[in-house]
Amino acid sequence: MNKSILLFFVTMASFSSFALAQSKNDVIHLIDGPKEVQVIEVGFNTIKYSFPNENTVYSISKHQVSKIEFASGREEVFNSPFKPVNGLDDFQNVYISYNPEDVVGLDPRGELFSKATGVTTLSSINNVKNRAMDKLKAEASMLGANVVLVGNVFQRGNQYGGENQAGNSTQTTFSGTAYSTQKLDLEKAKSMLLDQSFHHYQTHKLNRNSWSPERAIATVYDKDRKPLMFEFDKVIEKEDGVYVSASKIPTKTKELKVIHADNEMVVVMERNDKIITNYILISKDNKYFKNLASRVIL
């Protein structure tokens, strides 16, 4: 009798353990946080999964996944090529993709276009193509994007002219859409923008018809020969992000979009037709002021 009862409990315990193991799901770690799912397939470029008790199968780029914790206890880690981009200085970190699955679920930042043309019919085709690509990355970075999905590419080789016909130098154009994996914490950004004063340190500008982006020091000193500080007149939250206005920034645009904000630096952006401009604003916590304190301004 005692053996029968013991066998019953052992059987029930085994069944419960099996059921628990069966009910446990996989955990997929995405850019926006972990999700409990059932992983169906880990392919070369994509991962297919479904949600518990659902039949719909979803597909996502492996670039958007940092890790999978399988129900079995095994873990698989992925190295994403997506890197942080806070403005023009990080333009080389912009990831170029030709695969639409790479940008599913990412935050769109705007349409892009870049063009580069050789100076003469002896210009290097590769050099011109690389310059067009750098301009594409630069424009994306100035929109606060770190991923570009290329839509169209046009490339023309050098065309040598004749006695009655002018030649054409090589040209490359790219068009695409900018995306970001980095989402601005709206409440945190608004609080920080309202609580601090800033100095307009640099201005970065890109004209699509120009050779490359321009960088200019914008520092203005007050009557005591100290960098001029200012506060924002308004901080506004909209559907697509946070906007600010400040009379101390030399722009005719009433509202500038915030593309990056931390304790040391804020980058705000305006875009007019073919020209995009970033205003680099720094706070008292920036290392620039620490270095300034160690020297004397004449």
Predicted regions span which residues?
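Bacterial Sec-dependent N-terminal signal peptides
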Residues: M1-K24
